Amino acid sequence: MEHGCMAELGRRVRIGGPYFEDLAHGRVFADAPSVTLTDGLAAVSQAIFGDRLRLPLDATLCAAVTGGAAALAHPMLVCNVVIGQRTGPSQRVRGNLFYRGLVLLRPVFIGDTLRTRTEVVGLKQNAVREGRPATGLVALRVRAANQHGEPVLDFWRCPMLPLGDAGVRTGHADGFEDIPAELEPGQVAAAVPEGWRLDAFRDACPGEHFADLVDGTLYEVESRDTVTCAPELARLTLNMAQTHTDAAASAFGRRLVYGGHTISVAAAQLVRALPNLVTIVAWRGCDHLAPVFEEDLLRSEVEVGSLHPLDGGGGLVELRVVVHAARGVTADAEEARVLDWRLWGLMA
């Protein structure tokens, strides 16, 4: 049984998430608590990642650019909260394979409240391998809205879940072809916030802006970050995946770092390469290539891709961030590629 809020007297009820065979196409999860983004949430997230993205840090600049009094919530804080809200169906996750088609449809500010809805849109049982637990892939469509019912985030993710009964043959064999492999430029441009004064950002912030970028430039961020506070971030964002807080639930015998933690480190390192990044608008895709563990040392390579000017100045830039991990405290250990993140950023 997945959960038991209405247990009969004297009945023993185990509380936990579904196994792969418990899920069905079209099943919707919409029972997660809504979350109001607060200064406290933002401060704890900032303490973990030390991100230098300007608008969430600078109230004066934020007001000049956005025209509002509220502070912009960091896009990664928004993503982490929404992902955490939606871990109900993936509490038993063995690992998350990818994110696809993530678009931040409108800005989110401190004080906004996020509500999410997740639908099972694809199921694929993996081939049984000797000596390994039986598993399956679950394609989830996640949508989030603010307190006004306005959509703020839309994406697909693919967790791998174990089967409760290794002998079950579900027949699920979806190919996930309906999950978009790419985002169209027009789709991303439609998510650029209306009315933002990118000229005010350019005037206030010295250094490279959109017009200074060169397609094909590769930035190697030398300063590495040690992964810390991984269970704390999971709890902060209501992430219920057992593998992030319980080593016994991990396929590796040690706690697995939540994928958004690694992406957030990558985002912070991205801003070191591009200090005048205005915000993140969308993710073309994000693949977890290998697991990340606490105390790993992460470094990023940032590649500038295609540049898309906007009519009012500034533009969208396609970026690719590849993250490498050296394991544990052995700073000189051989590195592993752990993340391939393709995103769209807004520059002034």
Would you name each region that the model predicts?
Residues H3-H25, I110-A191, E294, E303-A348:
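HotDog/MaoC-like acyl-thioester-processing domains
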Residues D31, T116-T118, V221, S300-V302:
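A generic structural signal for residues embedded in beta-strands
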